[in-house]
Structure formats: C-alpha cells, structure tokens
Amino acid sequence: MIFKAFDLERLLSDWEQTVEFNFAESGVHPVPLKELLEFADADLNEFLDIPLNYPEVNGDLKLRQRIQELYNGAGLDNVIVTVGASEANYILANTLLMEGDEVAVMGPTYMQFSGAASNLGAKVKTFSLNENKAWALDIEELQEAVTPNTKVIAVVNPNNPTGKILSEKEMDVLITAAEKVNAWLIADEVYGGAEREKTQPTSSFYGKYNKVITVNGLSKAYGLPGLRIGWIVAPVNLIQELWKRHEYTTVSSSMLGNRLGEMALRPHVRRQLLDRTRKLVGQGFDVLQQILDEYGSGIQITQVQTQKADPPDQVIDAFR
C-alpha cells in the first residue's frame, strides 16, 4: 500500500519559516518563555536543575492532574499525554481502525486524522458544515455518512478552518448518531479557548457519551506549540490500548514540555494565556476586516460564531 503524504503539512513546512506574511497560520503568535514564567510568577532558576530525563511515559503526574481537572468526571487514568495533538490523532487512528473500516469525518477540516485513516486502508466519508447556512451542520450528509459499519465519527470543535462552533443541539445530533451505530466519537478541541466572541471555552464533548474521546493540546489556544504537549481523555480501557501505540511511536513527550505544560495549566496561568489569545484574535480580526474593506473586493467574512441554525428536535429523534 502506498503511504500518502500529508500534502498540506508539507506545503506549510516548506514555506512557513520563510514567508513574511503567513495567512495559513492557524494559531496565535507564540508565547515567549519569559512571558510564561511571568504569568506563573516563576523563576527561570527553578528549571535549571531539572534533570533532562524521560518523564512518566503517559505524562507527568502533575500535568495529568491539571488536565484531569478540565474535564468533569475524568480521572487520572482517563488521561494520556502525547507529543502534541498530532500524535494523539495518529495513535487513535492506529488503535481504532483497520483496513476496510468506515470513518465519518466532519469537513472542512485539518486533514491529519482522515489522512492517517486512509493510510490504514479505512474508508473515509465526509459530512459537511454547510457554507450556505453559516456553516451549520449538514444533517442530511451526516445521515448518509454514518452507517452501521461506521467505527469512528471525527469532528473538530471549534472548527478549523471555518471557526464554526457547534451548538448544543448540533453536538446532540452527533452524539445521537454515534450512539445509534455504537461508533467512537473523536472530538479534537484544540481551539477551545481561542473563541473571539466568548469569554469561556466551548463546552467539551467529554462525558456526553461513553465512547467520546477528546483530543487537546497547548499549541493553538494556549500559544505554546513549541512545547509539543497534547493529550487524550478517553475511557480507561482505551487509554491502555493507546499507551501501547504511544510506546512504539514517541515513548514520551519531553521533560521540559511536561513541566512547562503543567505550569501553563495552573488556573491563574491558564486564564492569562487564554485572555492573551482572545486579545490577539480580536485584534487580528479587526485588522483583517480593515484590509478586506479596502482591498478585498468580492471577499466577505461570515461571522459563524454568532450564527445558529439549530436542527429541530425531530431531526435529533430521527437518529435514535
């Protein structure tokens, strides 16, 4: 089987470090180490004596405790730390899927999980966020994409690249669709906290269904991509299976990444990081709007975060 390249990531890798203006960037300007330490009221010297050893393979205990606190009902054994959300998605695909399995992926989206699934020989189907309806979930396409053979339904919420935030009813539709066919639902939630028009992160899928898997990390909403810290929160028995693949891929993330990641998730530091991100997103949006007003003839912005097109209750019932 020919292993397909991740063309989007290769394109970004070729150019993102050399161009002057990068309109393909999906994060905010990264946080300098000095600023992170200032947010935490920490001294650099406390890190100079850290032995550069391996951390715990499933993630430093204190870091996993910080992650656990973000998810109602989660315990330490529900958490595994990965090298960014990218490793999380990769080991999920390799754990849950085999050749011939069906996967339903919400689009448009960052194509890493669907690419990994394709490379395993899985059949990838897509269902859309409808551009003509302010990127509302396309219920008809979802019904067509999800079958009794569907092993995984994968979504990104808040969505990359549209910025769409699923409403509670849209989330309910997805949960109901997964329950009906006993599929896993993977929710990549790395943009939760980067919302321009909200002061609280988007609610998580975690806990809404016993086969929900959430993926997150410090790269996007936190502005800390260089730490390469991601995580998966999932049922304990699945975490044990993911651990096996984790040991074959990266073994662990870095010791410094774990220590600084724990610092970033301390409540008062986390709040400052997310405030910083929202400020940058708001300022950037205003600049973009000014540029388009002046030069962007024929280009318009759909402010999807503020628009709702909830499916009626009878649509939800149709999946039951």
Residue ranges and their predicted role:
Residues 211-278:
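Conserved core segment of the aminotransferase class I/II
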Residues 119-125:
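A short helix-loop-beta submotif of the ANL/AMP-binding
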Residues 23-26, 67, 79, 103, ...:
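Generic structural signal for small/hydrophobic residues in well-ordered secondary structure
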Residues 95-117:
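Conserved PLP-anchoring active-site segment centered on the Schiff-base-forming lysine
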Residues 2-84, 91, 265-267:
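N-terminal small-domain helix-loop-helix segment of the aminotransferase-like
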Residues 101, 122, 180-183, 210:
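A short helix->loop->beta-strand "cap" motif at the edges of active sites that frequently abuts
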Residues 131-200:
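Active-site phosphate-binding strand-loop segment of PLP-dependent enzymes
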Residues 283, 289-320:
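Elongated, amphipathic alpha-helices that form coiled-coils and helical stalk/scaffold elements used
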